[in-house]
């Protein structure tokens, strides 16, 4: 699937949601029903400390490696729509493209290491290595965890040196 120059043969559709926070996107992955849409909605509604947050796509995302970066874009048929449990599928402003800065993997809480190793905090997708955060699924603090991690990364930090003192609200 990889071509020379660090680009895939074309976009790959994957079951995920993506939100742009400031200048970088969060690719939210997880099993069906794990809370991807809920986390995306929470990040968009309360994006502090980021001044800007917008949906890229919900449920299905087109992902492509290009020049060592991972890019996400919406599937045309569902662009600008998000599923909000209890309300259904609703329209929402969206961005056409995001450079992914964090992989947020919704995971059962018991499967998340209490003290992650450095290798737990990085993952490779389509040949691009990225920071990875295991996020407890269906947890009310999930959005805060993602926002704090993204803020730390935006300031030039690495998840391996993340500190609670880094949190800015």
Language-model segments: which ranges?
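P-loop NTPase catalytic core of nucleic-acid-dependent motor ATPases
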Residues: 15-22
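Glycine-rich phosphate-binding P-loop
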Residues: 23-48
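Conserved NTP phosphate-binding and transfer environment spanning the P-loop NTPase/kinase superfamily
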Residues: 96-169
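Short acidic/polar mixed-charge low-complexity motifs
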Residues: 24-26, 78, 128
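N-terminal pre-Walker A segment at the start of P-loop NTPase domains
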Residues: 1-14
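Conserved nucleotide-sensing/catalytic segment adjacent to the nucleotide-binding pocket
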Residues: 49-106
């Amino acid at each position: 699937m990889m071509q020379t120059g660090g680009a895939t043969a074309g976009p790959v559709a994957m079951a995920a949601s993506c939100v742009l926070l400031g200048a970088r996107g969060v690719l939210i992955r997880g099993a069906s029903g794990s809370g991807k849409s809920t986390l995306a909605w929470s990040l968009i509604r309360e994006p502090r400390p980021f001044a800007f947050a917008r949906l890229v796509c919900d449920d299905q995302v087109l992902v492509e490696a290009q020049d060592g970066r991972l890019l996400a874009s919406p599937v045309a048929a569902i662009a600008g729509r998000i599923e909000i449990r209890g309300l259904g599928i609703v329209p929402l402003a969206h961005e056409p493209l995001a450079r992914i800065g964090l992989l947020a993997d919704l995971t059962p809480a018991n499967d998340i290491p209490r003290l992650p190793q450095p290798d737990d905090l990085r993952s490779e997708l389509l040949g691009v290595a990225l920071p990875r955060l295991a996020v407890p699924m269906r947890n009310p603090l999930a959005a805060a965890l993602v926002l704090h991690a993204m803020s730390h990364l935006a300031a030039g930090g690495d998840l391996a040196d993340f500190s609670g003192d880094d949190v800015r609200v």
